[in-house]
Amino acid sequence: MKKLYLKTHGCQMNEYDSAKMADVLKFSHGLELTEDPAVADVFLLNTCSVREKAQTKVFSELGRWRPFKEKRPHVVIGVGGCVASQEGETILKQAPFVDIVFGPQTLHRLPDLLDSVIQKRKSVVDITFPEIEKFDRLPQPRAEGPSAFVSIMEGCSKYCTFCVVPYTRGEEISRPFDDVIAEVASLCEQGVREITLLGQNVNDYRGLMHDGQVADLALLIHYLAAMDNIERIRFTTSHPSAFSENLIDAYAEEPKLANHLHLPVQSGSDRILAAMKRNYTVLEYKSKIRKLRAVRPDISLSSDFIIGFPGETDADFEATMNLIHDMGFDHSFSFIYSPRPGTPAAQLPDDVPMAVKKERLAILQNRINAKAAEISQSMVGTQQRILVTGPSKKYPDQLSGRTENNRVVNFNGDTPLIGQMVTIKIKEARPYSLWGEIC
């Protein structure tokens, strides 16, 4: 049996895409995943271009793979994802031993691309944006545990000045409503109990229904919540400007919708938000969160922050810290700004000194970590309903799952509990998890 070695950089969308790559190549070529590159026949790198030095990271990884091909010339090396979409033929110029370059929207063509390389021994590049064809050409979904990701849309049409996603994944395209329902139903039949809906701006979802009507994310959630086997629904990532009243109503009406929201704000300064072209103000962001908390008072809120965007002053950063205090974020993905090639912000002077960026990042992360620890400590003594997803990564002799507010809980239990909803009494708050006992 031939082997596939697959490495993934980046977000949950990339994790979802990587799973589909493995599925489509298993279906077409019988490739089995391996964690040992020494025995692999096909190497795939699914890339992300969001963070700094993304291209350098890709070529470093490819450099580590090159000796495997030199030893075993039949090996095929492919590069997919957003860096592939952004760089295209440049990857072949810098790493001529690469055989396949493909974008996020063309992963369904991997079998044909692989056949072409095997037959002609010539590199191929396919980084087009063929609408939503990708989803129509993939095998039936395959569950791996009680929790699953389901991509409901692709791309982004917001064109924030710092972001490469519209250029690497294309503009927003929503999957047809019935296709999403069918995929979730298939996963349910395989034992999935928790669904996380994915999209670059998932709350911009507009799926065509069979009767010609268009469903938004809130309506999709209502339909999924009506499925008996679904216990919990999550979604990520949202854009504040598209966070609608309908979605707030869904939080009020659907208890299966998890008590957690990730809503990236990026900055607490209106001036910086305008420079980022985020299309909302701090007041508008706060207003949406207040409306949400009116129906879900104890909802957990996480966010993204970019530190040191061009022109960010001490006053701008202080405004961000004030927003963090007011909103009570208990988790964040925060990182130092670095220009992404091809974006409007890359034309701006990167004028915030690196030492200042690092200092601000440390201040922000310390504040949010302190709030997270406070919330975790407040959960000690409470009873929490969790979905048991499998053995704990840190404590393999224990089981693990997540709370409504997205915290990892480890506890002693038997393997048959995996895939079940159980109630745990929290006994201890640890730095990155909770520990408890079955009630």
Curated annotation (Swiss-Prot):
SMART domains: Elp3 (SM00729). Monomer. Its EC number is 2.8.4.3. Residues 142-374 form the Radical SAM core domain. [4Fe-4S] cluster 1 binds at residues 11, 48, 82. GO terms for molecular function: 4 iron, 4 sulfur cluster binding; metal ion binding; N6-isopentenyladenosine methylthiotransferase activity. Keywords: 4Fe-4S, Cytoplasm, Iron, Iron-sulfur, Metal-binding, S-adenosyl-L-methionine, Transferase, tRNA processing. The lineage of its organism: Bacteria, Pseudomonadati, Pseudomonadota, Gammaproteobacteria, Legionellales. InterPro entries: Elp3/MiaA/NifB-like_rSAM (IPR006638), Methylthiotransferase (IPR005839), Methylthiotransferase_CS (IPR020612), Methylthiotransferase_N (IPR013848), Methylthiotransferase_N_sf (IPR038135), MiaB_methiolase (IPR006463), rSAM (IPR007197), rSAM_horseshoe (IPR023404). Its cofactor is [4Fe-4S] cluster. This is tRNA-2-methylthio-N(6)-dimethylallyladenosine synthase. Pfam families: Radical_SAM, TRAM, UPF0004. It is found in: Cytoplasm. It comes from Coxiella burnetii (strain RSA 493 / Nine Mile phase I). It catalyses: N(6)-dimethylallyladenosine(37) in tRNA + (sulfur carrier)-SH + AH2 + 2 S-adenosyl-L-methionine = 2-methylsulfanyl-N(6)-dimethylallyladenosine(37) in tRNA + (sulfur carrier)-H + 5'-deoxyadenosine + L-methionine + A + S-adenosyl-L-homocysteine + 2 H(+).
